[in-house]
A protein has these predicted regions:
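Short C-terminal tail/terminal secondary-structure segment
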Residues: 2-3, 20-21, 102, 153, ...
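Conserved glycine-rich cofactor-binding loop
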Residues: 11, 18-20
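Conserved mid-core segment of classical short-chain dehydrogenase/reductases
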Residues: 75, 98-114, 157-160, 270-271
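Catalytic Tyr-X3-Lys loop
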Residues: 89, 109-125, 144, 161, ...
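Catalytic loop of short-chain dehydrogenase/reductase
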Residues: 97, 144-167, 172-181, 192-194
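C-terminal helical subdomain
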Residues: 125, 188, 211-253, 260-262
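Alpha-helical segment proximal to the catalytic Tyr-Lys
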Residues: 133, 177-178, 251
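Short, small/polar-rich loop/turn modules that mediate ligand/substrate recognition or access, typified
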Residues: 180, 185, 253-255
């Protein structure tokens, strides 16, 4: 029996939707017939992505340049989405600042801490608050947050990155409780290491530096990290998890934190 997801004709918002994981999520949703509201800070790549997905899948795709750290910008995006679609069924909070691998983050000025949190967890709350009035109360409303294993594993020295991810996980539970009466489910996907364009480029560089193949470097890296599957996740695998949580098949899931890290969380140690 085919797994019908029931997403055709629904509208999904994806933040950070112009590239990387966000673009893969947007493509997955479009492939299931969902219309799209795509948000990112820059319009150029966003417009290209929206045009490609609209042409390929025959869906409507609205690109909106917006900054999730600015309340006015987020509210303007919500009003544009209302004008275009009226209803937004699915909100995917994917946008976030890149991990900054800087030593001694405790010595940063507090404006840097606040800026990093503003660009992920606080910005995601702004998005949720602004788009909530557009979401239906008929059981099809879905809020899907993207955090990461830095919520539970210390990726030194990425202090604010870990704080952001842990806060996203915790906010999910609170929002699931608050929005249950509106029949809106709220869940978090907790990916481990994902083979984004940037991470693939890093692996290429490291392999060259170590005079080995990329495949050999990645095999050794995953073994050292304790990734039981022996590889990174693909962006499409993250998107597939979003599709399930967005679908009618996930009606009973709320407040969940879906770990997809290839077994990294198992944390195996020799006996």
């Amino acid at each position: 029996m085919a797994l019908e997801l029931g997403l055709k004709g629904r509208t999904a918002l994806v933040t950070g939707g112009s590239k990387g994981i966000g673009r893969a999520i947007a493509r997955g949703l479009a492939s299931e017939g969902a219309n799209l509201v795509l948000l990112a800070r820059g319009m150029d790549a966003l417009a290209v992505t929206a045009g490609e997905l609209s042409t390929q899948y025959g869906v409507k795709a609205l690109p909106l340049a917006a900054d999730i750290t600015k309340t006015d910008s987020v509210q303007a995006a919500a009003e544009a989405a209302r004008a275009a679609f009226g209803t937004v069924h699915i909100v995917v909070n994917n946008a976030g600042n890149p991990m900054r691998r800087t030593d001694r983050q405790i010595l940063w000025p507090d404006t840097d801490w606040i800026g990093d949190l503003d660009g992920k967890v606080i910005g995601s709350l702004r998005i949720t608050q602004a788009f909530l009035p557009l979401m239906p109360g008929d059981g099809t409303g879905r809020i899907i947050n993207i955090s990461g294993t830095a919520s539970t594993v210390v990726w030194a020295p990425a202090l604010t990155h870990g704080m952001n991810n842990a806060a996203m996980n915790q906010a999910t539970g609170y929002l699931a409780h608050d929005l249950a009466s509106q029949q809106i489910t709220v869940n978090t996907i907790v990916p481990g290491l994902v083979g984004t364009e940037g991470r693939q480029a890093w692996a290429d560089t490291m392999a060259k530096q170590q005079n080995t193949t990329k495949e050999e470097f990645l095999a050794g890296f995953c073994k050292r990290m304790g990734i039981l599957t022996g590889r990174w996740a693909t962006m499409e695998e993250v998107a597939d998890t979003v599709l399930f949580l967005a679908s009618d098949r996930a009606r009973y899931y709320t407040g969940a934190k879906i770990i997809m890290d290839g077994g990294l969380n198992v944390n195996v140690r020799p006996a």
